[in-house]
Amino acid sequence: MDFPREFDVIVVGGGHAGTEAALAAARAGAQTLLLTHNIETLGQMSCNPSIGGIGKGHLVKEVDALGGAMAIATDEAGIQFRILNSSKGPAVRATRAQADRVLYRNAIRAQLENQPNLWLFQQAVDDLMVQGDQVVGAVTQIGLRFRARTVVLTAGTFLNGLIHVGLQNYSGGRAGDPPANSLGQRLKELQLPQGRLKTGTPPRIDGRSINYSVLEEQPGDLDPVPVFSFLGKASMHPRQLPCWITHTNARTHEIIRGGLDRSPMYSGVIEGVGPRYCPSIEDKIHRFADKASHQVFLEPEGLNTHEIYPNGVSTSLPFDVQYELIHSLPGLENAHILRPGYAIEYDYFDPRALKSTLETKAISGLFFAGQINGTTGYEEAAAQGLLAGANAALQAQGKEPWVPRRDEAYLGVLVDDLVTRGVTEPYRMFTSRAEYRLSLREDNADLRLTEIGRRLGLVDDVRWDAFSRKRDAVAQEVERLKSTWVNPRVLPAHAAEALLGKAIEREYSLSDLLKRPNVSYEALMQARTDEGELLAGPGVLEDQVLAEQVETQVKYAGYIARQQDEVQKHLSHEQQPIPADIDYDAVTSLSFEVRQKLKTHRPETIGQAARVSGVTPAAISLLLIHLKRLHYGSRKQAA
């Protein structure tokens, strides 16, 4: 039967991509339906109980700046928070949190259930309704037909999912959940380019059977306690817990090597490629044979469970080998395994067949987000979900889409990498992937993106008011530092030596003083004159977030300005569109190889064309000349 209500957007899947997609579409004003095989698993953390990390934390902050759910849910569920790379520059500092799985899932579900314009419905999707080259809806396993202007598919690892433990395997979307085989078969019929990838998870341990006395404790940051959301507060966090560290050893490695003949990875049973930056323990032992040991982080899964996630020993080895390797680890000699580790192999679709909006090129109105695009990680999935959901809503409403640029957001880097370069292994975000990372910091994600989110309808009044106050306060304080001057009479020698290491001999602005390497904003605001009065303070010192933002903007102003100059030069051609119907065979000045690559990839802009492997700068120059001729010819014809 046809469901009586029609929708603007249907989102298929309730993982990290699907939930952000549904929330974004609904916030943008679209009548949105989220279809999931099980409402109880909305927002489920299928693998590790953590959010964030290098590059990943930047994505979470960007999702938050655009009104998304992940960061605030992490603040409500996080049981340990840390700033990684805290001793390095602000561009590569990243927030990471351990999360209570149940609290996180509950926080996401609460946001979904309280979001206007959003309906939830529990049914697995078996088919897509396609008329010509336009998607018009989805069909569930009991034959219900839901109609919509656009569909966002976020199927995760469920498409023809195959779970491996040793040489045994069975169909599944993840442990305990059925696969989406019918939907996977339907997508094959649509002849979208696809492949197989693999990921894995470690066995879970009963924490009561661990000897913590021989382990290294890893507490979270306490002064100050980090928060993820720009609207978050440390007071939102539940009780905090430590993690623990152990190490593999020669005995562990011997056990693993002895079981490789029964490993599905090394016996050829698994065809899919696994994630390079989150390898299985058997892959680590094989690839880094000269390494004597590897760290294993024992991470709590929640406040009301004894279950421990041993991060670093993801495996698909047979259970008897898993049993031995776990018991070879210091502190885990008597550990009780609650769940075996496994690998899962699944279908993904070549993201080069997507537009930069994450809409498929072949089928209008059909958007893909998350692991279906060849990525790995909750954060990468959430970011894609938000973008796909927003663009699906905009398209359904007849509005222009939004495509973030590489200089605007890590989300822009992520999408551009996917649609221009594709993937040969699960894609993970790193700060090193962003050429403009000094401008793409965690701390300024809201200053970069919240105004855009407001324009798209993604940002509510509460977030907008908080952002506006922060933006204005930072701008006013930066301007005050530039326009306030001090001289040797105002800043006496002893005070200057304490602050700067030497007396000043001429007049300086406060901004100039703050740019010096050893001067902090806090020290500058606390400096006093001979009369005991504050030289320049207190400024915004009472608000640590504002103080850090002001210090970063002032100290790195020169570097950021130079980077922005680079961006402006680059943008002159970066955004130049390439006609969708361009005949590359007519560009005879290009080599046959380059023409073939451009015909295969069909880049949307000159910037994308330049990033296609094998397309040289000389080829781009020739393509630009051809586009000028086309433009001149069309103008002449019109005249």
Curated annotation (Swiss-Prot):
Any Pfam family hit: SAM_GIDA_C
Cofactors required: FAD
Subcellular location(s) per record: Cytoplasm
Keywords: Cytoplasm, FAD, Flavoprotein, NAD, tRNA processing
Molecular functions per Gene Ontology: flavin adenine dinucleotide binding
Alphabetical list of SMART domains matching this protein: GIDA_assoc_3
Residues annotated for NAD(+) binding in this entry: 274-288
Domain of life according to the entry: Bacteria
Gene Ontology biological process terms in this record: tRNA methylation; tRNA wobble uridine modification
GO cellular-component term (any): cytosol
Cross-referenced SUPFAM superfamilies: FAD/NAD(P)-binding domain
Chain sites annotated for binding FAD: 13-18
HAMAP family referenced in this protein's UniProt entry, alphabetically: MnmG_GidA (MF_00129)
Function: NAD-binding protein involved in the addition of a carboxymethylaminomethyl (cmnm) group at the wobble position (U34) of certain tRNAs, forming tRNA-cmnm(5)s(2)U34.
Assembly mode: Homodimer. Heterotetramer of two MnmE and two MnmG subunits.
Family: Belongs to the MnmG family.
Protein name (record): tRNA uridine 5-carboxymethylaminomethyl modification enzyme MnmG
Organism: Bordetella pertussis (strain Tohama I / ATCC BAA-589 / NCTC 13251)
Gene name per UniProt: mnmG
